[in-house]
């Protein structure tokens, strides 16, 4: 597949971790021995000073005045010896605060939640990467995946092999992807670009800042479950980066178990629509090249044409969040009306509470956010270690 991109004139990149992400390459994985290892690295071997309580989702904070004392789950209260560190993510951390009476007063009062502190910025400033899939049926010689996913016996045998030693088809198919970041040539000449603030224009013109991302070999059944498992296909994801719109998450119930309403405001600005249309068109042009088209049988999911109207309509029909949400509890300086967390990750206006997840990150990186989330957690740990002399 990467040969097809190269023949079409797309650049290749031998190292996406070099500081320059531009170009296509095999995706970098955080797996070892057939297991996604990074997330549980600190749990192996099991730390003696750590207790994990399962099936105990936090519903609200225990607050006395301006002091956060602990957390409350359904039927149980847990009190902190030093601080509460909230790490529930960009959607759930604001939810816990709001159900604790900390957030936009109008929303809290609407659902009869007593207001402890009116903080309008809680749940605002949401940023996220959006994407759409496009998929094509391919000749049998183009991919081996249906020989696996379309064969129940092969999958069962592969599962036994993976359970035994972490090897085999189950350890590779879900992580064998191509990925790349690209710029749109001549974007700076468009009226949509010229209407942006100068600082934003300067940022987007930097050589290492992409306008969109492409992922290859994505499982089509995530979007089109009706496609037979024996179908030979190629599925691409087209991500739009550096969107100008800002969304929000808001209360829709007094029940802590009901998720916040998620409104990313995708494609709200003219610039966002312009970049979304052009990025999708560039990937579709790749599929028309001889190197790719010679093995194409037909389309499984694609726009009706490459007109601006059809491309935008396709985005509007199939658009998805990438679960890269940031900014709903934004970090900033005291006095910043959009900020609720300081540079020590402390929730401003309260003692005993820090936030350590992607909700505090004030920008949306031009990358997948896994590493950023890990760095945020590690930074919080370092600050706690220094402040309380934990080592």
Where are these regions (language model features)?
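Structural core of flavin- and non-heme-iron oxidoreductases
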Residues: 1-391
């Amino acid at each position: 597949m990467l040969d097809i991109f190269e023949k079409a004139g797309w650049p290749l990149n031998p190292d996406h971790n070099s500081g320059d992400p531009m170009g296509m390459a095999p995706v970098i994985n955080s797996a070892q021995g057939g297991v996604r290892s990074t997330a549980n690295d600190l749990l192996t071997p099991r730390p003696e000073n750590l207790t994990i309580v399962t099936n105990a989702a936090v519903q609200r904070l225990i607050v006395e005045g301006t002091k956060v004392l602990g957390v409350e789950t359904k039927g149980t209260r847990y009190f902190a010896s030093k601080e509460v560190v909230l790490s529930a993510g960009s959607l759930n951390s604001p939810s816990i605060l709001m159900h604790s009476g900390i957030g936009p007063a109008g929303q809290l009062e609407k659902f009869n939640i007593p207001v402890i502190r009116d903080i309008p910025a809680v749940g605002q400033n949401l940023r996220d990467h959006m994407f759409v899939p496009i998929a094509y049926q391919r000749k049998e010689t183009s991919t081996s995946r249906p020989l696996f996913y379309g064969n129940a016996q092969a999958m069962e045998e592969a599962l036994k092999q993976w359970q035994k030693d972490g090897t085999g088809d189950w350890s590779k198919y879900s992580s064998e992807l191509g990925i790349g970041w690209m710029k749109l040539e001549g974007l700076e000449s468009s009226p949509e670009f010229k209407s942006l603030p100068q600082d934003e224009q300067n940022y987007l013109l930097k050589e290492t800042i992409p306008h969109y991302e492409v992922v290859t070999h994505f499982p089509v059944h995530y979007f089109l479950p009706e496609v037979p498992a024996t179908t030979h296909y190629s599925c691409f994801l087209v991500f739009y980066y550096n969107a100008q719109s800002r969304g929000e998450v808001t209360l829709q119930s007094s029940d802590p178990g009901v998720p916040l309403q998620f409104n990313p405001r995708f494609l709200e600005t003219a610039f966002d629509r312009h970049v979304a249309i052009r990025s999708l068109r560039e990937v579709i042009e790749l599929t028309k090249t001889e190197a790719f088209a010679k093995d194409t049988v037909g389309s499984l999911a694609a726009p009706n044409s490459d007109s601006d109207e059809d491309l935008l309509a396709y985005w509007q029909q199939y658009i998805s969040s990438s679960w890269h949400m940031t900014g709903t509890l934004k970090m900033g300086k005291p006095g910043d009306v959009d900020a609720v967390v300081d540079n020590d990750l402390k929730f401003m206006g309260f003692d005993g509470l820090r936030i350590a997840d992607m909700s505090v990150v004030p920008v949306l990186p031009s990358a997948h956010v896994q590493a950023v989330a890990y760095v945020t957690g590690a930074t919080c740990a370092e600050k706690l270690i220094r402040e309380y002399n934990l080592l």
